Regions:
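Active-site-proximal gating segments in proteases and membrane effectors
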Residues: 98-124, 189-193, 202, 209, ...
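Alpha-helical membrane-inserting segments
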Residues: 16, 20-32, 55-59, 63, ...
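Peri-catalytic and regulatory segments of divalent metal-dependent proteins
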Residues: 60-159, 254-257
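Transmembrane alpha-helices and immediately adjacent membrane-cytoplasm interface residues
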Residues: 43-70, 93, 99, 205-217
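N-terminal low-structure segments adjacent to metalloprotease catalytic domains
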Residues: 1-59
Length: 290
């Protein structure tokens, strides 16, 4: 997905989250708890921010397999229909055994060369590869890609990212409401409840803080890719992993849902590189000693 589309989707998602949080806060009277004295009860606000911040993150994690299957139209390999599917299924399960994790669901989806892993725990994951990847890579390279995804599962990357996202969500909700309260009370001199200025300020602050916080999340995401590459090299071979990365680098960037740990192509640099979930292919190859 183009970076511009990702940012637009991110902003729209935050606006919807803000609307939902605001409605729930009003319905159950939460805002009355953290503004009961006319000022802000920071402890109460932090508690409620944490509840909503982590709830959203873990609900997304629990639904990740469901969302990924439908978003990518994944065909689960229950009974292999041909030798290729049989090999992919057996190779994935063999790599899972090597890594000490439960056998994941295995699937195939249409598209440019890519693969992803998702799921809420190490023993209930989904690993899927694209038809483009199967067609353009040799067996050693495909196996290295499968090993990369199994490494994500073994490292618990999805759960760790959910925890980090929960912390980030808490920070964004908490800080945005502090900014909104300051604007409403200090700048606009509104002494009765929270007016329009508060909600507008919260929306703007959530967008700004959300983008800044995403830089931290994406930085960690890039680190996990290096670790998964190294794990794949151990499960297969360094040469196979480097070969897979080089083959992937010749493909165009695929469109992947945000809920998955994708093998990933991110070639663009500059400031936008801070919002990329994957390091450049060349950097990943260098990290493997290639």
């Amino acid at each position: 997905m183009a970076i511009g589309k990702r940012i637009i989707l991110f902003i729209l998602t935050n606006l919807l989250v803000l609307l939902l949080v605001g409605i729930v806060f009003r319905m159950v009277g939460f805002s009355g708890y953290y503004t009961a004295t006319g000022g802000l009860d920071l402890t109460a606000l932090l508690v409620f921010s944490g509840i909503f911040g982590f709830a959203g993150s873990f609900i997304s994690l629990l639904l990740s397999k469901f969302i990924a299957k439908r978003a990518m139209r994944v065909q689960i390999i229950d009974t292999p229909r041909n030798p290729t599917e049989e090999w992919i299924l057996s190779a994935t399960h063999r790599l899972a055994d090597q890594a000490g994790v439960g056998k994941p669901e295995v699937g195939i989806f249409d598209g440019e060369p890519n693969a992803f892993a998702t799921g809420w725990n190490r023993n209930n994951a989904l690993v899927a590869v694209s038809t483009g990847l199967i067609q353009r890579m040799n067996k050693d390279e495909v196996e290295a890609v499968l090993a990369h995804e199994i490494a994500h599962v073994a490292n618990g990357d999805m759960v760790t990212l959910a925890l980090i996202q929960g912390v980030v969500n808490t920070f964004v909700i908490f800080m945005a409401r502090i900014v909104g309260h300051f604007v409403d009370r200090v700048l606009l001199k509104n002494e009765r409840g929270h007016g329009l200025g508060y909600w507008v300020s919260v929306i703007v602050a959530e967008i700004v803080f959300g983008l800044l916080a995403s830089i931290v999340v994406m930085w960690f995401s890039r680190l996990r890719e290096y670790r998964a590459d190294a794990g794949a090299a151990e499960l297969t071979s360094k040469g196979a992993m480097i070969g897979a990365l080089r083959a992937l680098g010749q493909s165009k960037e695929p469109d992947m849902p945000e809920q998955v740990a994708a093998f990933g192509i991110n070639a663009k640099g500059g400031l936008m590189a801070l919002l990329r979930s994957h390091p450049p292919i060349a950097d990943r190859i260098r990290a493997l000693g290639g």
